[in-house]
């Protein structure tokens, strides 16, 4: 029986649909929505090389992540937990899923994520995140289209 579900959320409607799917498929499970802030994104903005820019970028990314999680949680017809982490998306999703981030955390039973939540280059990146999670996860993974 699936008890703990981790759903990766990137702000796309597809990711929100993945969260809705998880809530409807496993109504009695503990669902956690996870958004990963990718530090590699900090060097892609126009302000990338200025002093203090990384701190400002991180604050903006954290605020955006909290907003995305709040919006996704509100869109799901279930009680869900939210979690915000900093790291490379694939590795961080897997670490959280395996319970490797917190010393006292149990592993999740299942991971749910969207196949491709964005367009253009970010679509390729998200697709590679989904593929990486599917290939390396120690637990079942559901990819929602």
List where the protein language model places each region:
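Terminal disorder- and signal-encoded targeting elements
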Residues: 1-6, 16, 50, 125, ...
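Acidic, proline/glycine-rich short linear motifs
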Residues: 37-64
């Amino acid at each position: 029986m699936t008890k703990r579900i981790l759903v990766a959320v990137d702000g796309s409607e597809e990711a929100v649909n993945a969260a809705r799917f998880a809530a409807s498929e496993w109504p009695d499970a503990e669902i956690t929505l996870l958004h990963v802030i990718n530090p590699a994104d900090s060097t892609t903005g126009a302000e990338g090389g200025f002093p203090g820019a990384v701190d400002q970028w991180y604050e903006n990314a954290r605020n955006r992540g909290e907003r995305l999680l709040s919006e996704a949680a509100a869109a799901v017809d279930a009680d869900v937990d939210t979690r915000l982490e900093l790291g490379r998306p694939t590795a961080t999703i897997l670490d959280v899923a395996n319970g490797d981030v917190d010393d006292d955390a149990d592993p999740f039973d299942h991971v749910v994520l969207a196949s491709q939540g964005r367009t253009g280059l970010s679509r390729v990146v998200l697709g590679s995140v989904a593929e990486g999670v599917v290939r390396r996860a120690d637990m079942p993974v559901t990819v929602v289209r």
